[in-house]
Structures are given as structure tokens and as C-alpha cells.
């Protein structure tokens, strides 16, 4: 997982670590990709778009193709990610439903923890 901002929740990596341990995948936490060599079969889970751009630039310089030489999953889908490098796989929450839920909680003056669904949009980068 690539996560360069200190203000991002580290619990995100805890969940990934638990998943990898359960299924026998190697994992590491990276604060950036600039000094990280890519190996066949590597998968980068990228939180910030800036890190995604850096990863794609480095791949171009090393003549590597996302989805063939290594994989990328990026957080939060955007129309641009549908086009970059033939399509970037994304993991994204349902922002519309999140807004509707928040609106209802505000109207009801309610406070509670809510599990919002996530979706994996599989594209060429994976």
C-alpha cells in the first residue's frame, strides 16, 4: 500500500495486512514509490492520485505496463481513472449513498457508526 500522507488513517493498512496474512500474500507499507523497484506480480494499492501519477510516470520510464508487469488499485473512482493507462482498477465507496445517509442523520440529529458499501471496479491495471 502506498500512502504518503500522515493524516491518512493507518487503520486502512491494518485491514490490508490482515487480508494478506489470511490469504498468504506478502505486503508492505510504502510512503512513496520513487525508490521502489517494480517486480513482476507486484500490486500497488494507491491512496492519493499524486502517488498514482508518480507510479505511472516511473512505469513509463522503466517501460513497464500496468496490468501486465505489475498491478495497480487506486482508491476512489473518477472518470479519468477509466482512461489512464487503459483503465485503472479502483476501490470506491458509494458517495451518493454516503451523502443520503449523512443527510438523514443530520435531519434526525442522530449520531451512529454506519458501514457504507465499497465496490471494486476491475480494469486493465489489475
Each PLM stretch: what is its role?
Residues 1-126:
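Bacterial carbohydrate/catabolite-sensing allosteric modules
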Amino acid at each position: 500500500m502506498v500512502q504518503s500522507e500522515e493524516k491518512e488513517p493507518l487503520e486502512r493498512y491494518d485491514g490490508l495486512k490482515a487480508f494478506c496474512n489470511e490469504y498468504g500474500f506478502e505486503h508492505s507499507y510504502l510512503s512513496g514509490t520513487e525508490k521502489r523497484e517494480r517486480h513482476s506480480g507486484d500490486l500497488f494499492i494507491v491512496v492519493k492520485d499524486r502517488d498514482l501519477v508518480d507510479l505511472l510516470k516511473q512505469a513509463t520510464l522503466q517501460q513497464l505496463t500496468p496490468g501486465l508487469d505489475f498491478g495497480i488499485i487506486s482508491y476512489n473512482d473518477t472518470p479519468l481513472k477509466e482512461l489512464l493507462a487503459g483503465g485503472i482498477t479502483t476501490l470506491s465507496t458509494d458517495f451518493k449513498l454516503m451523502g443520503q445517509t449523512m443527510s438523514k442523520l443530520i435531519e434526525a440529529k442522530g449520531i451512529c457508526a454506519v458501514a457504507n458499501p465499497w465496490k471494486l471496479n476491475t480494469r486493465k491495471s489489475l
